[in-house]
Amino acid sequence: MTRSTRRSRTVALTASAVMIALGATACGGSSGSSAGGAPGKGGTLTILDKADFDHLDPQRVYTTEGQSMDQEIVRTLTGWDETGSTPKLVGDLATDTGTPSKGATVWTFHLRHGVKYQDGTEVTAPDVKYGVERFFSSDINGGPPYAAQWLVGGSDYKGPYKGKELGSIQTPDKYTIVFHLNQPVADFNETTTMPGWSAVPKSHDTGSTYDTHVWSDGPYMIKSYTKNKELVLARNTHWSQATDPIRQQNVDGMNVRFGQDESAIDQQIKADAGTAQTSIQQWPIAGSDLAQLANDPSLKIRYYKIPAPGINYLAINTTRVKNPKVRQAIEYAIDKTTVRGAFGGSAYGDYATTMLSPGIGGYRKFNLYGANPAGNLAKAKELMKQAGNPKPSMSIAVENTPTEEHFADAVKTALERIGITVNITPIDASSYFSTINNTKNQYDLTWGDWIADWPNASTVLPTLFDGRLIKKNPQANQDLSYLNDPKVNALIDKAAKTADVKQRNATYGQMDQQILKDAAVVPLMYMNFSEMAGSKVGGVIPDTIVAEPSLVHVYIKK
């Protein structure tokens, strides 16, 4: 998953890891009881954001921020209960976590009775079927690839707008839905925690404009939505706590305000005056502020640092930068110390040398391009010499934030030392990923980040590096390197067919090394997510699945 710390990902951490991240203090704003007494009712939570969401349409959303917000609006077949010491997979719309059969190629879910939309009508299995079928429509795009990859007939299905249904999704009755898969997927019920595995009533589907008209079956519904300005959520009066094991409905509403400078958001929350006391930021702390705020003792109770086994990286377009020697030279030339400084220093994360993060099944520690995070300029120049001393000009795409632009400056400085001219192209943060995921883009270098959709390498490497998916997803391509290496593709297929977890993880480790041998990406940092809340905001817990502060139990202190 993605996003400016906003892309995907779904990572479960141990309780000890979370406590370390919060400074080993249970008095941090990490739970209702620890943040000032029992949850109260009423009040409005203000959410401050630099940019609008790429999408809220549940079948299109594939960012951490969008997925976090969708948790308030839509319910999924399964979900994560994070009130205990570790996240627990539970039924959400479904009564339980599903039943596999036929070697995990068939999954059956039974829906709860009495789950209501915002107009009081009941959620049904055909609504979920229709919602999942929307994944396949070319009229809407941007979401994760799993439905197309795993559902029988998915490779040829064009979505419900063409007037046809997908036969591999069956609804034998009003409350039962059955998925037929083309391969065994033992963790399919973790896939169904993602927003797209939710109900969309056909009568309220507005197609490409559904982003601003999402029909709610969660505790909050969209009252008004002015893109790039403000999203206002109000209570869904037909939502029932008795049917929802995950969420609460404590505040009266939520106002998301877009378009504020990232550093201005930091300083507003830090000052804790007026409405800032009942506000939380949903944009990461600016790199220029992070070191100071992370080490300010007075902010400890309001500061959230969430380790997220995810990766911040520089993708090299292998179809544009075709010479592997030049790509290898870039690997050695990048100074990760200045790059990390742009993102906020050590508080942002550790230096990365692999695409799989520690904590992800399949991670293997290795470093193909030297131990010095500052790079190896001599080696980089030697590789450029072997490539014939070209003097290429390359474009780099980044979000239009000070943090990202400082990062681009660091890349530009590093590469110009080896004769590469770098042209920086800032892209509006609200449309950044939809722009770079379009295969018509002309960028040589692209900043990206990724968090596993759940803690398995299957949600990282195949999505980011299966070159066979590029043509299938021309407007939602996640392979920013445009890598289509037969060796990598073969390893992806091998891993998918390997039932033994240890052997499968070994294959993913081998795959990670091959991708780095291809010099398709420069891994930069294993990321942390850092954000703050006002002093009157309670009930915030670190969502170690979406890697955002969770709002499902949030309340305003009286």
Q: Each PLM stretch: what is its role?
A:
Residues 110, 127-129, 140-201, 224-226:
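Surface-exposed binding/hinge segments that line
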Residues 123-133, 174-181, 218-219, 249-253, ...:
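Alpha-helical secondary-structure segments
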Residues 164, 180-248, 253:
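Gly/Pro-rich hinge or "lid" segments in bacterial periplasmic/extracellular proteins
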Residues 223-234, 255-318:
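Extracellular/periplasmic solute-recognition and catalytic clefts
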Residues 531-558:
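Long beta-strand-rich cores associated with HINT superfamily self-processing modules
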